A protein has these predicted regions:
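Single conserved hydrophobic/aromatic residue that forms the stacking wall/gate
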Residues: 1-5, 9-10
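Short aromatic/basic micro-patch
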Residues: 2-3, 60, 84, 92, ...
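Cyclic-nucleotide recognition modules
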Residues: 59-121
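Polybasic "coupling" helices that flank or enter modular domains
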Residues: 103-173
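Phosphate-/nucleic-acid-contacting segments
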Residues: 148-214
C-alpha cells in the first residue's frame, strides 16, 4: 500500500510496539477495541471460551497479519480473545488514526474490505469442517491448516508450530483425549511421526484425503 504525506505521519507517529510472553493475553472477550494490531514476530491464537471452560481456537495469526479490527468496524466489543502461542511482538495503531487513513485512501479501504472478506471465507469453511466432519477428518484438516498457516521446517516435513495437545484439540473442536488418541492412530498408520510437540507430516496426500472425506 502506498501511503503518502500526512497519512504516513499519522501512522508513524501513533504506533507502539508491545511484547507478549508465551500464553500472555493480548485482548479479552468483552473489551472495547481501540487498536489495529499487526503481528511482527511470533504466533497468536484468536479463541473463544465455550461450554465447560473448553476453548475453541477460531483463527491463527502469523507475522505480518493484521487482527483485532473487525469488532471496531462493527461497533462491537470483542467477541473473541487473543493470546500469544509463543513470545510475540505486536505493533498497535490507534483505530482513530486508521479511520482517518481509510477516509483518505481508497486503496487502504479496499485492503481492509479484502482482508475481512478473506477472513469471512476462511471462517465459513472452518465452521462447516468442524461441525460436519468426524474426528479423524477434523484433526487431519487442522494439521493441513497449520501447514498452510505456518509452513514447514527446513526438513520439509515438520510443522513449524509446536502446539500442546490441548491447543490442537481446541483447534479441532474435540476433547484433548480424542486429540491424543487420534494423533496416536495417525502415527501408528505412519501418516505422521510425533516427537513431543513436534509433528512431522509423512503422508500428506493421505491426510488431505482423510480431511476431504471427513
Amino acid at each position: 500500500l502506498r501511503l503518502v504525506g500526512s497519512e504516513m505521519c499519522i501512522r508513524d507517529s501513533n504506533y507502539t510496539i508491545q511484547t507478549y510472553k508465551k500464553n500472555e493475553t493480548i485482548y479479552c472477550e468483552g473489551e472495547t477495541p481501540s487498536h489495529l494490531m499487526c503481528l511482527i514476530s511470533g504466533k497468536v491464537k484468536i479463541f473463544k471460551d465455550g461450554v465447560g471452560g473448553r476453548s475453541q481456537i477460531i483463527r491463527m495469526i502469523k507475522p505480518r497479519e493484521y487482527f483485532a479490527y473487525r469488532a471496531y468496524f462493527a461497533k462491537q466489543d470483542f467477541v473473541t480473545a487473543a493470546a500469544a502461542f509463543e513470545p510475540s511482538v505486536v505493533c498497535l495503531i490507534p483505530m482513530s488514526a486508521i479511520t482517518t487513513l481509510v477516509a483518505q485512501n481508497n486503496d487502504l479501504a479496499m485492503f481492509f474490505i479484502r482482508q475481512l472478506s478473506i477472513d469471512l471465507g476462511i471462517s465459513d469453511e472452518r465452521t462447516v469442517n468442524l461441525t460436519q466432519k468426524h474426528i479423524r477428518g477434523r484433526l487431519a484438516e487442522s494439521l493441513m491448516f497449520l501447514k498452510e498457516s505456518y509452513g514447514l521446517e527446513e526438513d520439509g516435513s515438520t510443522l513449524s508450530i509446536y502446539l500442546s495437545r490441548e491447543d490442537l484439540a481446541n483447534l479441532s473442536n474435540m476433547t484433548t483425549s480424542n486429540a491424543i488418541r487420534t494423533l496416536s492412530q495417525f502415527a501408528a498408520e505412519r501418516l505422521i511421526t510425533i516427537d513431543g510437540r513436534k509433528i512431522k507430516i509423512i503422508e500428506e496426500e493421505k491426510l488431505k484425503k482423510i480431511s476431504k472425506i471427513g
